[in-house]
């Protein structure tokens, strides 16, 4: 809104032309969301603590984990999403369908996550709403959003699936694009949610993936760069860089409070929304497979849970001491800081591989 307001004065004040540059507004978006989260983080934590908005800890988890985490406020995703959305509303082009789709997914998944967090706090356990209700709600939200997006987006090849490393390998998914998009967005949302189990564990990988896609969305929306890199050019996609910048800034601000020992957890309010929004960005930029590479840590965490469940149902035995896999290493006696930093290193490597796919074709 602020961006569109300033455009009215470009002819009078020539220096305002700088706001037309996506890179400049991406930087503004990052620093705006960062500043907002840093400013409101402390008061929000005090408010949540005083109101006993505390995270119910799994009683079957590692003993050291239970002792350290008890009494920590949750629903910190409210802080993240507030900073993110205010920043995007200020510096994004709100007439852009891609930006609107990202905002829709973020708000919808955030509200669903907040409802889940509320139920956990209300009943003082880590169960919250049922898995069936959560997934069904995510599917319905995504179907509605992706249907409108496909209808209004100005890109005829939106249903194409592009493969990294192979410039001519393209599959037109047709109507299967909608269930595929649902799988990507819902899967991404729940994968980030599963990863958010240790202080700062999910936050840094989210920042890394958002950083990669800030670059990817910019070059995808630039006809010169997209032609040079031999990736699909999608008009208007560059605006998504501003959304990604807001994610980076708000998560950096949140990490200030979420770094070990965490003063607050993001809860499902943050993890479901951030995961869903990254999935949406992957769909918009037509880099869904690259999303799975850069967000490989999230994939690993989700797969570890699925493998654990399938193994137990088929054989009665568990492959891991506890799932998701970060709890397995906790059970083995690894210090929390060791697990978190090593998983961050994995995320950095995967992010570099994901970016390398843009050139290696």
Give, region by region, the residue ranges found by the protein language model.
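Divalent metal-coordination and catalytic microenvironments
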Residues: 76, 117, 268
């Amino acid at each position: 809104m602020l961006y569109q307001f300033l455009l009215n004065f470009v002819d009078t004040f020539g220096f305002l032309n700088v706001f037309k540059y996506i890179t400049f507004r991406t930087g503004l978006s990052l620093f705006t969301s960062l500043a907002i989260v840093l400013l409101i983080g402390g008061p929000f934590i005090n408010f949540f603590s005083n109101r006993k908005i505390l995270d119910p800890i799994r009683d079957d988890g590692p003993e050291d984990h239970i002792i350290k985490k008890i009494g920590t406020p949750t629903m910190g995703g409210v802080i993240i999403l507030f900073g993110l959305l205010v920043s995007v509303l200020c510096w994004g082009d709100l007439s852009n369908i891609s930006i609107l789709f990202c905002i829709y997914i973020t708000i919808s998944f955030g509200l669903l996550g907040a409802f889940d967090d509320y139920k956990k706090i209300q009943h003082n356990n880590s169960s919250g709403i049922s898995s069936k209700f959560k997934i069904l709600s995510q599917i319905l939200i995504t179907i509605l959003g992706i249907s409108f997006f496909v209808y209004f987006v100005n890109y005829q090849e939106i249903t194409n699936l592009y493969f990294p490393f192979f410039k001519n390998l393209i599959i037109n998914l047709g109507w299967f694009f909608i269930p595929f998009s649902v799988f990507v967005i819902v899967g991404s949302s729940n994968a980030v949610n599963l990863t958010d189990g240790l202080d700062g564990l999910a936050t840094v990988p989210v920042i890394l993936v958002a950083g990669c896609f800030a670059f990817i969305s910019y070059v995808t929306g630039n006809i010169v760069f997209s032609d040079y890199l031999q990736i699909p050019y999608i008009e208007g996609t560059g605006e998504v860089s501003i959304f990604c910048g807001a994610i980076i800034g708000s998560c950096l601000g949140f990490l200030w409070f979420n770094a070990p020992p965490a003063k607050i957890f993001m809860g499902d309010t943050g993890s479901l929304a951030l995961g869903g929004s990254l999935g949406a960005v992957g769909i918009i930029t037509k880099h869904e497979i690259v999303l799975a590479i850069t967000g490989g840590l999230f994939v690993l965490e989700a797969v570890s849970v699925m493998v654990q469940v399938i193994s137990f149902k088929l054989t009665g035995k568990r492959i891991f001491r506890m799932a998701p896999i970060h709890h397995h290493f906790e059970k083995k006696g690894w210090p929390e800081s060791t697990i978190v930093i090593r998983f961050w290193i994995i995320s950095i490597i995967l992010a570099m591989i994901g970016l390398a796919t843009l050139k290696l074709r």
